[in-house]
A protein has these predicted regions:
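Non-heme di-metal
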Residues: 1-190
Length: 190
């Protein structure tokens, strides 16, 4: 397509992998949902922290776009609205620990590899393109899955308000999609 946005959109749209979120929404058991939450806790209890390392590694419009996205991830100054706090609330409602690192020993190699990759991108300036590209891909592909994760929570029985973590992501990530794809990645490429 010739634009950063168009190229990113083509890349994420090309993924035709089976949707885990649809399985969770329609068929998963409570035990499967809880295992999913355990795996997600490795990242989501510190959500945004690794991507925030990109802020001092950027400048101009790219930096401003990342700060805007991260501010929302951190609840815009309200600690109860921080995405990590909402995920912790979900874990407690599902009868799981909200202690950061509490499930590292249960994490799969795939879970740890993903979290380690984000940390590596954030810690090394030379990987800032990978860091912002990862964030853009995440923001551009998460609205639908988060909607389905919320359906799974409501279907399987943790209190409905526990789905607030996923509902927040549906709303926020729809806004972040443009900011990450155009404002962040587009500005970095310029």
């Amino acid at each position: 397509s010739g634009t950063v946005w168009g190229d990113l959109r083509a890349l994420v749209d090309a993924d035709d992998g089976p949707p885990l979120s649809l399985h969770l929404a329609r068929w998963a058991t409570l035990a499967q949902l809880r295992e999913f939450l355990v795996q997600r806790s490795v990242y989501h209890l510190r959500e945004a922290d690794s991507h925030t390392w990109g802020i001092p590694r950027l400048s101009g419009r790219a930096k401003a776009a990342l700060v805007e996205i991260q501010s929302d991830e951190y609840g815009n100054g309200d600690d109860t609205r921080m995405h990590s706090a909402l995920f912790a609330q979900l874990l407690r409602a599902a009868g799981l620990s909200d202690t950061y690192g509490g499930y590292w020993h249960d994490a799969t190699a795939e879970t740890l590899a993903g979290v380690n990759a984000i940390s590596m991108f954030g810690l090394h300036r030379r990987h800032r393109g990978a860091l912002v590209g990862h964030l853009a891909a995440l923001e551009m592909t998460s609205t639908g899955p988060n909607r389905n994760y919320g359906k799974a929570v409501r279907r399987l029985g943790p209190p409905a308000e526990a789905a607030a973590s996923f509902a927040e992501h549906v709303e926020a990530d729809a806004v972040h999609e443009q900011g990450a794809g155009v404002g962040l990645c587009g500005a970095l490429v310029e």
